[in-house]
Amino acid sequence: MLATSRDLVEMRLRDDAAEWKALAERLEARRVLDIGAGLEGLPDEGEFDLIVAPNDPFAGILDDGARAAAIANVRRLLARDGLLVIEGLYVPPQEDAVASTPDGLIRERKFDDGSVERELWTAIGQHQYEIRTNGSAPTRVRAWHCGETALRESGARIAGGLDERDFDPWGDRLIAVVPGWS
């Protein structure tokens, strides 16, 4: 989806829409591509100042090489000074320890309508987890970590938020900022 920085807030149906909009404005990005809905609909060509990846569309890619290839495929759409900003799925060490126990890690979200979404996270090794939502069949995902091969190979910078604060390994957020090709 192509948007100007003004349109970014309307695109996001998230609590942090203002934060993503502020990022686009701070970077003075005129051409913005939002890939938060997935990597399947990537355009064949284009040159974007900013590509935003909220909701980690890379989380389902479990292999190092495949993840690096997916990042390279997205990077080809960046302008020379453009940035790819990934809100990476991150599991801090204290939550990984709980997910590694037989009972796993339970996360619950309550919605305005009173419904509750319950996720059971089970660590399976190498930063991979099986997630069961409300008793559904498991989905396998891979969380990011600071030593991630795909990030290192792409020259990414790791931050703790869209405001570029330092990454805190005990915190709950990992933002990867991948530069365009130079």
Where are these regions (language model features)?
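A short His-aromatic
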Residues: A59-I61
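A short acidic, Gly/Pro-enriched loop at the edge of an enzyme's catalytic core
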Residues: L42-I51
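A short glycine-rich, Lys/Arg-flanked "PGG" loop and its adjoining helix->strand segment in the class I
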Residues: A66-L83
